[in-house]
């Protein structure tokens, strides 16, 4: 037990140090080459050699660091909770169709609305209309999932219903793409590639507040999640209200997925791969240790992905969803090969 606790502390410390190093790397490296001494001056509140460098560090790189850290943690926490409640190692935030709902909302704005949301009261265009469309789409699907949750007792049936919702939204998106203009299709395709640079410094407080709120709910669910590892009957004998826990979990994952997808686009593999990576590092399915390690590992992986995206320098920025499968897929393959050695739901 002492050895196990020591191992967990080592993992915590290593991940925390890795995050600090990756944050520093993301601040000092980017598509624009800024000398290290000037980055230090900017971070210290002094003037740099060029005014544009100050703008790049504070208005671009700093928000991207915080966004990547929170987004990685949010997606990973969602994946862990869904894998536990559905006892399915392949569950993640996209499996209930919530991220597909966000994608449908954006498709309606970009492909059908020409990038504008117009009502009799106000008109919203540009990036804000995309964020609002994604958020409303995700919340609409979340409301539908919560409604189905009140009717369907079986987790497996609810999972299947969520997958069907995802198929329906994907079909609607395909129809919108078919009838849309080439410019609209291109804009939607770029959004679908994912990007941590979509949150400005002014939007960062709202993004952080909503994400942290969802993460706090996830942390509060650690005890009932551990009870669910024993099975629904044992959990009920321990006084856990299965349906209430499931609804809270759906609400938390829905909020986290809606916020991250609306601001950053649909990001693949992080929510699916990181919980497995955390289990591999800890060798346990106890959420008291697993949840914090999952949050840290998710933040670290997202920061690493963001760093890789800007490595080409002035040649351009690599799409985020071109990087995440390269890092996430090998983890899943390793899990499939060594699934008997990994503690999942017991």
Predicted features, each with a name:
Residues 1-346:
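Alpha-helical transmembrane segments in inner-membrane proteins
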């Amino acid at each position: 037990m002492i050895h196990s606790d020591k191992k967990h502390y080592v993992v915590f410390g290593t991940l925390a140090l890795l995050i600090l190093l990756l944050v520093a790397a993301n601040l000092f490296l980017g598509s624009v080459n800024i000398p290290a001494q000037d980055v230090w001056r900017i971070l210290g509140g002094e003037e740099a050699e060029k005014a544009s460098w100050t703008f790049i560090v504070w208005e671009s790189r700093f928000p991207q660091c915080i966004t990547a850290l929170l987004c990685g943690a949010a997606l990973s926490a969602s994946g862990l909770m869904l894998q536990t409640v559905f006892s399915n190692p392949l569950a993640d935030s996209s499996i209930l169709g919530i991220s597909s709902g966000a994608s449908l909302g954006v498709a309606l704005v970009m492909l059908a609305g020409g990038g504008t949301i117009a009502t009799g009261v106000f008109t919203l265009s540009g990036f804000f209309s995309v964020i609002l469309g994604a958020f409303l789409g995700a919340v609409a699907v979340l409301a539908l999932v919560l409604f189905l949750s009140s009717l369907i007792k079986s987790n497996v049936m609810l999972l299947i219903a969520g997958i069907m919702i995802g198929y329906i939204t994907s079909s609607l998106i395909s129809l919108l793409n078919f009838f849309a203009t080439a410019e609209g299709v291109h804009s939607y395709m770029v959004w679908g590639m994912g990007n941590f640079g979509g949150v400005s410094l002014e939007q960062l407080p709202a993004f952080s507040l909503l994400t942290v709120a969802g993460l706090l709910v996830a942390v509060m669910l650690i005890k009932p999640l551990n009870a669910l590892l024993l099975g629904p009957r044992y959990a009920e004998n321990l006084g856990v209200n299965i349906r209430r826990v499931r609804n809270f979990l759906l609400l938390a994952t829905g909020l986290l997925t809606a916020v991250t997808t609306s601001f950053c686009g649909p990001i693949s593999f992080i929510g699916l791969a990181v919980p497995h990576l955390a289990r591999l590092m800890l060798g346990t399915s106890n959420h008291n240790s697993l949840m914090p390690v999952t949050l840290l590992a998710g933040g670290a992986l997202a920061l690493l992905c963001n760093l890789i995206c800007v490595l080409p320098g002035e040649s351009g920025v690599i799409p985020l969803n071109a990087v995440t499968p390269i890092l996430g897929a090998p983890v899943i393959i390793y899990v499939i090969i060594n699934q008997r050695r990994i503690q999942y739901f017991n």
